[in-house]
């Protein structure tokens, strides 16, 4: 297939996919602020549910972070069962184990409590449980006949925005690929953005997940599927990140900064629900699948490099972001404003301790990574397609 044919093929696929992604989607009821997990628990009780499966990871469970929420659920008349087998980049086997646990415990609903991995796993558990199938039966776009069982979310990191999206990403250990489950019913009925839960988050996780939120905001804004709503959420998320991420990293006890970052993450999730992402995610997903690079860290490493590639094709939109975030005025040229934005991203990365390179990329793997990243990236509404040469240069630039 020639390069021109590939472009036509991917644009056709994007056109077909846009019929789903550009439709208005439901938004979760959101409780925000200290104690919002208790408010969510009370709301779950009002849904008339009997027993909820709490999907989380073992470290959070062992630390007792769930205790307040569990007690609030019990006071609301909701019994709980806990599945704490989620690991970073959850696999189909982990999700299948969660589905088995759901049925064994005779639950009627699911609560995700954790980072993006726990939320993604919980989404597919809720969908698979409703359809009496395993993960394989859920993979793809709208593969299941029945909607997910009632599903709720408490994100414990501020970055993925997964509590606002209808996509779940599942890792395939055999192919080193990321598989997706896409269904509007994966959007939670309600979520809590509680900064108190995020208070103890380590600096390096705060930094990486925060840059994930910024990447969502920027890629959704400069992409070809933007709407008035996604533009609003994207710009708002950008400003929240630039105003609060460094402070959240410096002072994790600053609950106002934590809450602002949680809101930035949520807004980023709302933006990508319709506008999707771009090549930063396409490359980062493959670094995560191949080497286990944390998703937020991969995005942070790649974001300024990919924007350098696309700056001529997205100058006006990048300039919009710079002005909205107070980096310059409209009296300046769009080129100058774009330069300020990219430089500010570099400066923010440095300030919060994001490294400029990684030592995990093996030279022998680069061509395979390029193929996988460009195949994935071709499905996203990026301002333009990037070339193999450009992708190769980006990978070399972040390799130490």
Where are these regions (language model features)?
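An N-terminal, well-structured beta->alpha segment
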Residues: 1-82
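C-terminal charged capping/lid subdomain of soluble metabolic enzymes
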Residues: 4-5, 9, 318, 325-400
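N-terminal small/polar loop signature for handling phosphorylated ligands or for N-terminal nucleophile
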Residues: 61-133, 247-258
């Amino acid at each position: 297939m020639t390069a021109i044919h590939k472009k036509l093929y991917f644009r056709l696929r994007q056109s077909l996919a846009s019929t789903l992604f550009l439709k208005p989607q439901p938004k979760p009821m959101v409780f925000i602020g200290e104690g919002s997990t208790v408010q969510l628990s009370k709301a779950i009780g009002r849904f008339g549910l009997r027993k909820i499966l709490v999907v989380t990871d073992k470290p959070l469970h062992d630390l007792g972070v769930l205790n307040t929420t569990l007690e609030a659920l019990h006071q609301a008349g909701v019994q709980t069962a806990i599945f704490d087998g989620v690991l970073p980049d959850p696999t189909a086997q982990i999700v299948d184990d969660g589905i088995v646990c759901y049925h064994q415990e005779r639950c009627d609903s699911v609560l995700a409590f954790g980072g993006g991995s726990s939320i993604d796993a919980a989404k597919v558990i809720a969908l698979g449980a409703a359809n009496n199938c395993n993960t394989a039966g859920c993979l793809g776009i709208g593969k299941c006949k029945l909607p997910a069982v009632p599903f709720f979310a408490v994100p414990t990191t501020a970055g993925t925005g997964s509590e606002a999206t209808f996509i779940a990403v599942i890792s395939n250990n055999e192919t080193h690929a990321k598989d997706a489950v896409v269904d509007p019913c994966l959007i939670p009925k309600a979520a809590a953005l509680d900064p108190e839960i995020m208070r103890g988050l380590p600096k390096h996780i705060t930094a990486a997940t925060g840059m994930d939120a910024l990447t969502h905001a920027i890629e959704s804004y400069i992409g070809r599927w933007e709407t008035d709503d996604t533009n609003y959420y994207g710009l708002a998320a950008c400003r929240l990140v630039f105003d609060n991420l460094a402070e959240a990293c410096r002072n994790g006890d600053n609950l106002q900064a934590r809450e602002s970052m949680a809101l930035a993450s949520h807004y980023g999730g709302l933006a990508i629900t319709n506008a999707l992402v771009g090549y930063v995610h396409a490359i980062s997903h493959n670094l995560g699948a191949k080497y286990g690079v944390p998703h937020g860290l991969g995005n942070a490493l790649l974001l300024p490099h990919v924007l350098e590639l696309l700056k001529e094709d997205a100058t006006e939109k990048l300039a919009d972001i710079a002005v909205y975030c107070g980096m310059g005025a409209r009296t300046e040229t769009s080129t100058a404003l774009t330069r300020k934005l990219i430089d500010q991203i570099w400066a923010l990365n440095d300030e919060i301790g994001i490294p400029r390179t990684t030592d995990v990329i093996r030279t022998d793997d680069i061509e395979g990574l390029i193929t996988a990243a460009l195949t994935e990236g071709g499905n996203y509404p990026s301002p333009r397609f990037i070339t193999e040469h450009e992708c190769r240069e980006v990978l070399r630039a972040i390799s130490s």
